[in-house]
Regions:
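Sec/Tat signal peptide C-region and signal peptidase I cleavage site
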Residues: 18-22
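Bacterial N-terminal signal peptides that target proteins for export
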Residues: 1-11
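Asp-box/BNR beta-propeller blade signature and adjacent active/binding-site loops
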Residues: 23-378
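Basic polycationic patches enriched in arginine
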Residues: 6, 380-381
Length: 381
């Protein structure tokens, strides 16, 4: 009965969310894929939101001056490498690293990975020093001949720049695909040796799509999918952003108190929460599946999950600002959706993809974040 009540309660919340929050299309003039959204923190750009999308042979950049209420096209980053690009990442350098000043923007994308029969491929890095208005090619952190995907950036505990990515380059050693990283001590000018973060040399499993966030405690959290295990979403932690434990350990599957889990293209964000020094982690995946039979859950495409214990323990389902009820295994609907919490931890902006007719479009909306549970009070005598 308790579970039934909770299900009815969530259904009601979803209905209210759909009424109270009218989602808006970001730009109906062109298809958009693989969203990334960040809040800029430096100089005259502080407070602006920046979003990037894969748009054919270019990265499409948009800006919002009003915390995500409205968006305008800013520029395109042309990437000429045939046949096209995929799975781009967007990052603002939070402090000076080597010769790279704070506020530098990096945008990186996978190229050459969709050629028939495969061939030379790489992750190409572009840099902007003016808040995303103009971009120049910077360098190539990773190159190969089979497949390289999904660049993600961060700073480790030593303040070094790290690029995380998915790689198929070690198939001959048994890694069908793995998650790896490289470290730069000079702000991205040069890159160190490859380190495997998640991977098993069984010729089968395909971990991918890493997202990394630093927690207030100084620890780091990574979410990712593992195809070969249903493409389910997993989480693991690190003390320093570069030491992630035994790579063959799959980590902890992200499961809700409702008996569901995410599959495909997970992302994670951290938000402050009043009264909770840990803050809260917000995770979302493309599909919501039942734990018991892996069938689509009734709330598929309609929720994200919240965790207040640094990624351990239970996750709680919460209505998504942009519901995508027809989410399915496809590179458009609800694929790699973005959650960007407000600086005060009271709201969250979601940017999610949906089909508008036969065209993939980005939609956005802001909604309240869950408040911290109130501490229990002693009854008066």
């Amino acid at each position: 009965m308790k579970k039934l009540f909770r299900g009815l309660q969530l259904t009601g919340m979803l209905a209210l969310a759909g009424v109270a929050h009218a989602q808006r299309a970001l730009d109906l003039s062109r298809p958009n894929y693989y969203p990334r959204v960040i809040r800029l923190s430096h100089g005259t750009n502080a407070g602006r939101l920046l979003a990037s999308f894969d748009a054919g042979k270019a990265g499409a950049l948009y800006e919002s001056p009003d915390n995500g209420k409205t968006w305008q096209h800013l520029t395109d980053v042309a990437e000429p490498t045939p046949p096209g690009m995929c799975c781009s990442g967007l990052f603002e350098v939070p402090k000076q690293v080597g010769a790279t000043p704070a506020g530098t923007l990096f945008w990186a994308t996978s190229v050459g990975t969709d050629k028939g029969g495969r061939g030379p491929c790489s992750i190409r890095l572009y840099r902007s020093l003016d808040g995303g208005r103009s971009w120049q090619f910077f360098n190539t952190p990773v190159s190969g001949f089979i497949g390289l995907w999904e660049p993600e950036f961060g700073l480790d505990a030593q303040g070094r720049l790290v690029v995380y990515y998915s790689s198929e380059e070690r198939k001959a050693s048994g890694y069908n695909q793995m998650l790896a990283h490289k470290v730069s001590t000079d702000g991205g000018l040069t890159w160190g040796e490859e380190v495997i973060d998640v991977g098993k040399a069984d010729g089968h499993l395909r971990p991918g799509m890493a997202i990394v966030r630093r927690l207030p405690s100084g620890r780091y959290v990574m979410t990712y999918e593992i195809c070969g295990l249903g493409c389910d979403a997993y989480v693991r932690t690190s003390p320093d952003g570069v030491s992630w434990g035994d790579p063959a350990d799959p980590g902890q599957r992200i499961e809700s108190t409702e008996g569901h889990h995410f599959a495909h293209a997970p992302t994670v964000a951290w938000a402050p929460q009043k009264g909770n020094p840990n803050g809260q982690l917000l995770a979302i995946g493309q599909l919501l599946l039942n734990n018991n039979d892996n069938a689509l859950a009734p709330a598929n495409g309609r929720v994200y999950m919240v965790n207040t214990q640094n990624g351990t323990g239970p996750w709680t389902e919460t209505p998504a600002p942009v519901p995508v009820p027809d989410a399915k295994d496809n590179p458009c609907p609800n694929y790699s959706s973005q959650l960007l919490p407000g600086v005060d931890g009271l709201t969250v902006l979601e940017v999610a993809l949906k089909f508008e007719g036969s065209t993939c479009q980005a939609f956005y909306q802001t909604a309240p974040l869950p408040a911290a549970p109130k501490p229990a009070t002693r009854p008066r005598r």
